[in-house]
UniProtKB/Swiss-Prot annotation:
Keywords: Cell cycle, Cell division. Coiled coil: none annotated. This is Cell division topological specificity factor. InterPro entries: MinE, MinE_sf. Prevents the cell division inhibition by proteins MinC and MinD at internal division sites while permitting inhibition at polar sites. This ensures cell division at the proper site by restricting the formation of a division septum at the midpoint of the long axis of the cell. HAMAP family: MinE. It comes from the Bacteria. Belongs to the MinE family. The lineage of its organism: Bacteria, Pseudomonadati, Pseudomonadota, Alphaproteobacteria, Hyphomicrobiales. Disulfide bonds: none annotated. One of its GO terms (biological process) is regulation of division septum assembly.
Length: 91
């Protein structure tokens, strides 16, 4: 085994290692950022809807499912009885 092969083999692995690290960092950032995004969305949705209807903040649930090709945002808001009358009188 020549000395040149030792150096040429390592030079080729550096880009591969860099790419793997970038993929790992991107994956960790996406997982780390998800709860922050969900909390921000939840707070903004809560603020908009609560302008029109009194809400219990504990009754607002926001979920995000990330698929291979599509991400789905699900918002579940439990409205109190009589909320439909509040919408009609506000409009």
């Amino acid at each position: 085994m020549s000395v040149l092969r030792l150096f040429t083999g390592r030079a080729a692995s550096a880009p591969v290692a860099r790419e793997r690290l970038q993929i790992l960092l991107a994956h960790e950032r996406s997982l780390r950022g998800q709860p922050d995004l969900l909390m921000q969305l939840r707070e903004e949705i809560l603020a908009v809807v609560s302008r029109h209807v009194l809400l219990d903040p504990d009754k607002v649930i926001v979920r995000m499912d990330r698929g291979k090709h599509v991400s789905t945002l699900e918002v579940d808001i439990e409205l109190p009885n009589g909320a439909d009358r509040a919408f009609a009188s506000a409009g």
